[in-house]
């Protein structure tokens, strides 16, 4: 995976930070790690930082990723406001009732929403 994963032990969420060259494949790999970690720890919230990743992949891969975002989990995504890839994935996920939201401002706002969102 092109990026880093850390745990916020106090607030109990995973933080994913993707590098500029990351693709949808890296997202899928991170998702598998998150699902495994969630099963082991019960953590079901993630802060995902894709601000340095303007492009992620072909539309079909983006659609499949958005479609396959797990239910019963919450994802706050720090994004670049000019990334159509990120907006597309959010739209696909929201249309399927997933708890995902893009944030273009401060990380604090994203974390606040992440912690307030019901699971």
Model regions and ranges:
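Amphipathic, Lys/Arg-enriched alpha-helical "gate/interface" segment within cytosolic domains
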Residues: 1-119
